[in-house]
Amino acid sequence: MKKISTFIITKNESARIARAINSVKNITDEVIVVDNESTDDTVHIAKTLGAQVIVKPWLGYVGQKSFAESMCVNDWVLNIDADEELSQELQDEIEYIFTSHNQDRYLAYQIKLLIMYRGDQKPRMFAPLNKCTRLYNKKFASFANTINSTTHDSVVFNKDVDFTGKIYLLNGIAYHYSGTSIEQLVNKANFYSSEQAKDLVKQGKKLSNFRLATEMIWCFLKAFFIRRYFVFGFDGFVDSIIFAFARFLRLAKLRDLSLKSQNVITSDNYINYCMDFKSLLQQKKRNRYPKK
């Protein structure tokens, strides 16, 4: 028995959702798609492939994934994004673990995500690779445990859970396909940076002008060299600039929100200000013309 539920959040992913669902539907009991009111064929395609689709207005990345997670009937859940695909090797590995009833040796499993550049049919040598927890028992961990963030959507263990030695890195890989176009990447950068800026305000983050001035340069170098976007050639150079601009935007928007909050005068504050100002004038008048 499989006893795995897969959940995916979507928004206008008609070009990629089929690939994601097809890579998990044979190793899971159910596929839950929580869609943020897509205007394309995402919902139709997902339903055609047998997924259970729930249309849900946007709750933020963490909120949307937490809701999708709560809709899963099984304790063991697998989360992938619409732009991801499990390799056949990874599918076989997960299936073996669960058919042999060895899944409970660990509380969670990490997956290696290999970035595939748009249009590529196979991974490039030295392509960027990330590790993240995507297969886990939701009795012990959840996206809902994320604190003070709507954008950093990561699986967090319950406070009373000792997960030392209880996370296993799977050998198989999953493919993460980069944006469908420059326009899509820019739109995502604009939306995501706005969400991040709101989070930073809630967290009380402070910003220096030096940080704002150097953020884009540092983040470009980080993406192009440390994250190895250089393996994608000039296209990687362009994507590194977009990544750096997105990181700059979140700080610029944070500064903008902070300045606006400092200049806000509520009705109560305005009344109190007027009363204080009136009292000050009366005090000055008394000091200037003391009673005889």
UniProtKB/Swiss-Prot annotation:
This protein's record includes keyword Transferase: yes
Keywords, alphabetical: Glycosyltransferase, Transferase
Disulfide feature: none
EC annotation from Swiss-Prot or TrEMBL: 2.4.-.-
GO molecular function (one): glycosyltransferase activity
Enzyme class: transferase
Family annotation (InterPro entries): Glyco_trans_2-like, Nucleotide-diphossugar_trans
Source superkingdom: Bacteria
Keyword Transcription listed: no
Sequence similarity: Belongs to the glycosyltransferase 2 family. WaaE/KdtX subfamily.
Protein name (database record): Uncharacterized glycosyltransferase RP128
Origin species: Rickettsia prowazekii (strain Madrid E)
Lineage: Bacteria, Pseudomonadati, Pseudomonadota, Alphaproteobacteria, Rickettsiales
